[in-house]
């Protein structure tokens, strides 16, 4: 199974492909989709959509695992992250890729067994689980890989959106 993990954001959307081969996990394509801060929001969202659409067509993941929005104090930040997340979901839907959503708590519990784990602990576990030489950078890419690993582990109550293909 090929899992595309997504850490949505307007400035930086992290993505990471994790392939499940029996009980082993292997890292595939990963990186970040970047958008210029001074660019119009609609153009930034279109760029995220276009790049993610290209990645899905090239990598052909079996599923997309994406971070659920969590409580954010800053309403403006919540709105822009929600918009970026929306275009990620649209891209998956357009490509008939099943979507699974995970909260940050589920990701932390899946990788460390502790729901209040620090970001550095998550990154170290991504490195260890995927047998990487270094901690993946930037953080958004590491987070996307962590979300994909969470799906591979089958952690928590994954919420799949109903699809009829």
Predicted regions mapped to residue ranges:
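Phosphate- and other anionic-substrate recognition elements at nucleic-acid/protein interfaces
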Residues: 1-165
């Amino acid at each position: 199974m090929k899992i595309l993990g997504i850490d949505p954001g307007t400035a930086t959307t992290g993505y990471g492909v994790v392939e499940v081969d029996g009980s082993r996990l292997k890292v595939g394509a990963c990186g970040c989709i970047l958008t210029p801060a001074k660019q119009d929001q609609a153009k930034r969202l279109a760029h995220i959509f276009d790049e993610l659409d290209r990645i899905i067509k090239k990598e052909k993941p079996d599923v997309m695992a994406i971070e659920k929005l969590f409580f954010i104090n800053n309403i403006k930040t919540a709105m822009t992250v929600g918009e970026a997340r929306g275009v990620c979901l649209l891209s998956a839907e357009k490509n008939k890729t099943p979507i699974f959503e995970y909260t940050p708590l589920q990701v932390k519990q899946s990788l460390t067994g502790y729901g209040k784990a620090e970001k550095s602990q998550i990154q170290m576990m991504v490195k260890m689980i995927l047998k990487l030489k270094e901690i993946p950078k930037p953080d958004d890419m590491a987070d996307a890989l962590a979300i994909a690993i969470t799906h591979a582990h089958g952690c928590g109550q994954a919420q799949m959106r109903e699809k009829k293909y």
